[in-house]
Amino acid sequence: MTPRPRRDQERTGGGDGIGRSRAGPGREVWAARLLTFSAGAVNALGFLALGGVFTSVVTANSALVGIGVGHADAAPAVLAGLAVLGYVLGAASGGWAAARVRRARRAAAADFLLLELLLLWAVAAWWLRLDGHPGGWVRTTLLVLLSAAMGCQNAGVLVALGARAPTAYLTGLLTHAVTDAVTEGRLRWRAPATVGLLVAGAAGLALLERWLHGVAAVAPAVLVTGAWLLWRTDGAAPHAPAAGRAGRERGTAG
């Protein structure tokens, strides 16, 4: 395979980033970073305050369903199963919304995030109303809404940016980085940096949940709002149908 000219790599990011140029990362890049940070926060909130279940880690939640079945313990199995269902429904909605936005020339590419924002702000408002102490069916509903929000984000970013900018879908990103390192001697720093952002987001939310529990659910909504504003003011994102196909063909588990 003939390497692309350097000029083409500088314009497109060389396949290892989004929207890079000689001028450095644009607002679209910072928006993707904020989304990754927010994904860490949302997963931490789900795990710490909504039943010990992750909101976007389908592999772990599916395993929890199996563990619950094996132990004849319905509660964790049902909770994890509902989180997976919420994620799937959110992914379907987010992918559909992003595809419609991409076809609508007058719409900004970032507008698919409005669906995620609706879910996150609904959770934040409900959380504030209950002073951060949901219980019973309300807690389960909040978990499903957050899982749906993560599905919206992952699928929407995949449609809008292809495989170039996973925000909470990192198993494949890290696997490909390690594979490239051992087979081609090429280290892609973007992969561990992205994982680090997610870890930082989870750590930040954990601190907020500990010290300012009553407002913890507001943080993810604020972060994604900031990402939407950054991305929207950067203009329409470049479309990458080929990259999108490549990302889907990788079939990685989040």
Q: Can you describe what each PLM-predicted range is?
A:
Residues 2-238, 243-254:
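Alpha-helical transmembrane segments of multi-pass membrane proteins
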